[in-house]
Amino acid sequence: MNRLLVIAGPTASGKTALAVALARRLGGEIVNADSQQVYRGLDVGTAKPTAAERAAVPHHLLDVAEAGEGMDAARFAALADAAIADVAARGRLPIVAGGTGLYLRALLHGVVAAPGRDAALRARLEEEAARLGRPALHARLAALDPDAAARIRPNDLVRIVRALEIAAGGTRPSELYARHAFREDRYAARLLALDPPRASLHARIDARVAEMFAGGLLEEARALAARFGDALPPKLPIGYAEAIGCVRGELQLAEAVRRVQVAHRRYARRQVIWLRRERGVEWIAPPFDADDLARRVENG
């Protein structure tokens, strides 16, 4: 079983910088576990590692898919497995860095064996969501499987559609998850989660979002709008819909910045809640001392 170090935590908590620092000290390479950083061309709005960080330490699973291309936890886990095996085979330490809970869970504990995808049904459900609204599909799921609906936010179209797709095959999604229970340990993983105080995290989030809008997010949004027109991908990373609204003249810049700051703060809260439910998490309070953490990792 391959040894693995995982650096998790809420957005803007400093995962990337710490992962790079630890990789340099421990002879590691970084495997991305951020569901939005896999997409090419979405760099500023997803806070990808800088060119300097990527030059300092090898990174894997960045820019492996096109915007709008399907990427789910199962595909991510398969790609990550291959990257981790490659890093370990060269005598390096794989360091998984990211805050996407579904991806981390799939990698560490496996994925649920669910019925295959039905492209026609998915297209029909997505059309209904566009016509009736996502909450209408969520309500339909709640009628079929209240437990599954309770675990999915009413605006999370990707997960709602997948749950309805499973239910259409005669299986309750909640029963599938209950049977799996994510008990399997696929790696000898040490999971460190960064735990900054809420006030300082919110300040970092607000500053980062302002920097995104000043540092190229609008240009990325303009390129997306030119590429896709009115047929934008249904699940863009946080901030791109608002930035596209700005470049189209539908939203004032200050209001767009405010909305994205709020969205990132809410996302950070969900990430923390997710990690609190996971087993084996070591919470790390600031300051995040890379030398101290490297010694702790080396000493087991």
From Swiss-Prot:
Site positions per UniProt: Interaction with substrate tRNA: T100, R122
Subunit field text: Monomer.
NCBIfam families: miaA
Gene: miaA
Gene3D superfamilies: 1.10.20.140, P-loop containing nucleotide triphosphate hydrolases (3.40.50.300)
Annotated signal peptide: none
Reaction catalyzed: adenosine(37) in tRNA + dimethylallyl diphosphate = N(6)-dimethylallyladenosine(37) in tRNA + diphosphate
InterPro entries: Dimethylallyltransferase, IPT, P-loop_NTPase
Lineage top rank: taxon: Bacteria
Functional description taken from the UniProt entry: Catalyzes the transfer of a dimethylallyl group onto the adenine at position 37 in tRNAs that read codons beginning with uridine, leading to the formation of N6-(dimethylallyl)adenosine (i(6)A).
NADP recorded as keyword: no
Record key words, sorted: ATP-binding, Magnesium, Nucleotide-binding, Transferase, tRNA processing
Protein name: tRNA dimethylallyltransferase
Organism, as annotated: Anaeromyxobacter sp. (strain Fw109-5)
Cofactor entry: Mg(2+)
EC top class, as a word: transferase
UniProt record similarity statement: Belongs to the IPP transferase family.
Residues that bind ATP: G9, P10, T11, A12, S13, G14, K15, T16
BP GO annotations: tRNA modification
Region entry Interaction with substrate tRNA, spans: 34-37
Sequence positions that bind substrate: T11, A12, S13, G14, K15, T16
EC number: 2.5.1.75
A GO molecular-function annotation: ATP binding
